[in-house]
Amino acid sequence: MTSPTAPFWQTVPLDQMSSEQWESLCDGCGRCCLNKLRDEDTEEVIYTNVACRLLDTHTCRCTDYADRHRKVPDCVTLTPELLAEIDWLPPSCSYRLLRDGFDLPDWHPLRTGNEKGVHSSGASVQDRCISERRAGPLEDHLEDWPGEWPDRSPLCHALKRKG
């Protein structure tokens, strides 16, 4: 029997979540909205600090989420099916953490009730990125931090699914 107090992300498999539950997993860090390169020889993902032109680099939110696919045709809509295939999500991404059997971090908005923790933990891109409208060549903006665990955040615990 499932514990009535367990949060949904600990009991509901990703592919069975409602759209509201799925969307609420996004912590709003903005790391997935940074441009990435892929090494042609090694297939390694190379991160940059260059944000999609629709990302507000302070709030870390899309300025036109509802119409983003028309304005940015290669914007990815993350689904449980796609989640199984992609390798470029940052290590602190909630979707990746849950996919890989870990719990949400302590600073996640679903745990704290606000978005302050995602910024204070160092998980977000807040004021650490530049819009692609002003950046110039991506090669001039290579960074390691988007692909690393946030400096000011403890690691997550393995998730033992309830139920």
UniProtKB/Swiss-Prot annotation:
Pfam families: CxxCxxCC. Belongs to the UPF0260 family. This is UPF0260 protein GOX1406. InterPro entries: Puta_zinc/iron-chelating_dom, UCP006173. Disulfide bonds: none annotated.
